[in-house]
């Protein structure tokens, strides 16, 4: 297995570890008088998982190791990580459930649109909005996790959560518009095709001079 795919699988392994740390709120260790509580471990795990997302794409392009397995696993790993993190935060009472429904619902809507497009031979390109959304999700996740024992940053956490929700909605609308535009173009092409064939079968008589 190549390096990019190994990093993607590592990201998947981070998911249950993050969930256990958040839901058990452990470990809470003291190192030579320095307390390192569960929220620090949660942030570190989420950042490490996000780092593998950036690294696998970089190495796949750098080493020309883009594979079908990697194309399949990478978005699945991202969705597992974000879904598990935010569902755990709902269970901890740190994030409203309706926000997470929108965040995760967006992921499945876009995935569905991509699958339909792929089945029809269409391609929905990655959007800068999608990349911004993922960055905001990781940032908001880290701040919300850290706010579990640091109430002074709860307002910042709420602001970031709203930005995540807004970016999720905007990017979902963008993907739908791109999808609809491509479907509409395909439909118009199918409508024009019989006319073109009919013209070829029955060419107009060209008058001779």
Where are these regions (language model features)?
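Alpha-helical transmembrane bundles and membrane-interface segments of multipass inner-membrane proteins
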Residues: 1-209
